[in-house]
Amino acid sequence: MKKYIDEVLTSGHGKLYQSDGRHRVNPTEGYGTGGLLQGKKHMLSLTWNAPIEAFTREGDFFEGKDIDVLYMHFHKLNEFIGLTRLPTFLCNDVIKNLQVEKYLADYQVHLEKVFG
């Protein structure tokens, strides 16, 4: 993540974002609204070895937290430059329970749902 921030965002000043969005009149408001990519979107497509239950089950490893909670920093970084978040696609349990055909079918359904 740091490398992405260093190489993409830092060099993207003036191309990806103009400022942090705050105004001189009231510098406590408007933070995160200076992105230049308004109207564009981003979508995460992720693979995890963890089974879905590790995310969804209270008391399990991720304490019932959705994958997007774990990637909130990345979503907010993209929002900072003006991108709108699309629903994340997630393949779980990819090492101990590999199901390539299911993942491909699920991805196709996801793409059709998101992009029509």
Q: Model-found features: residue ranges?
A:
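Helix-loop-strand module that forms the ligand-binding subsite of alpha/beta enzymes
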Residues: 1-74
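Glycine-rich phosphate/pyrophosphate-binding loop and the adjoining helix
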Residues: 53-116
